[in-house]
Amino acid sequence: MSSQQSSSIALRFEQLKREGRMALMPFLMAGDPDLSVTAEVLLSLQAAGADMVELGMPYSDPLADGPVIQAAAARALAAGTTPKKVLEMLSSLRGQLSIPVILFTYSNPLLNVGMERFCEQAAEAGASGLVVPDLPLEEAERLSPIAEREGLDLVLLVAPTTPTERMGRIAQSSRGFTYLVSVTGVTGERSTMETRVEGLVQALKQSSPVPVAVGFGISGVDQVRQVRSWGADGAIVGSALVKRMASASLGSVAAEAGLFCSELRKAAD
């Protein structure tokens, strides 16, 4: 791939910008409750208006995740979910799933396979990007060109505690979009969001042309509207969706996920 401009993630953001809309980006844990349900949920989210999806690869020590997503990862691992099986499931949806899928994985599983092989396998399965929350910037700068060769955007994270100089460097290095963590700490729902994030959205947009998506702590319609009012290009909703899915009966998980996504979609437009 010659540049990030031609990536499916970049193209989706460009389309949304022309339409004056914000990207809705749900997160779900692959394999919770099992991979066949995950496949159904991905298609349900697409039908309900999700612009792209973050797909978590379950890991036993998820440092960035709060209790809801940790529990989802534990359920997925108990069900026998492995990175290989996640990619096989994703590959089986080629031809049906047209929205970009961004894999959310910790560095340990990625490094166990090897950066180059992992990126090859992810691209072959149809992924469009990667988020590796515990990967230091220096390692990310090594991984990014490897990912880009396979047509994958390596999305980097910025937190409210990130020093200003480093924030600019991260925004310049991120591909697809910059993932702005809206709160300090782990993922999870929040009733209010740190107002400082609004200033960070604008600072990031000034330091790099790459879109800015806000995640961690977005629990529903009100937060999605708030993020949109700040001028963010995308809103990532994880724990609230995972919790909604966990409380649904097995046969209605995909329908519940789609219903919640539809509610959020209206707020993002």
From Swiss-Prot:
Enzyme Commission number(s): 4.2.1.20
From the UniProt record, list the reaction(s) this protein catalyses.
(1S,2R)-1-C-(indol-3-yl)glycerol 3-phosphate + L-serine = D-glyceraldehyde 3-phosphate + L-tryptophan + H2O
Top-level EC class: lyase
Q: Which organism is it from?
A: Synechococcus sp. (strain CC9902)
- Protein name stated in the entry: Tryptophan synthase alpha chain
Q: Name one GO cellular component term.
A: cytosol
GO molecular function annotations of the record: tryptophan synthase activity
Q: Which UniProt keywords apply?
A: Amino-acid biosynthesis, Aromatic amino acid biosynthesis, Lyase, Tryptophan biosynthesis
Which sites are catalytic?
Answer: 54 (proton acceptor), 65 (proton acceptor)
Q: Which domain of life is it from?
A: Bacteria
- Give the family this protein belongs to, as stated in its UniProt record: Belongs to the TrpA family.
Report quaternary structure and partners: Tetramer of two alpha and two beta chains.
Main function? The alpha subunit is responsible for the aldol cleavage of indoleglycerol phosphate to indole and glyceraldehyde 3-phosphate.
Q: Which gene encodes it?
A: trpA
> What pathway or pathways are given for this protein in its record?
Amino-acid biosynthesis; L-tryptophan biosynthesis; L-tryptophan from chorismate: step 5/5
**Entry coiled-coil feature ranges:** none
Q: Which InterPro entries did the record assign? A: Aldolase_TIM, RibuloseP-bd_barrel, Trp_synthase_alpha_AS, Trp_synthase_suA
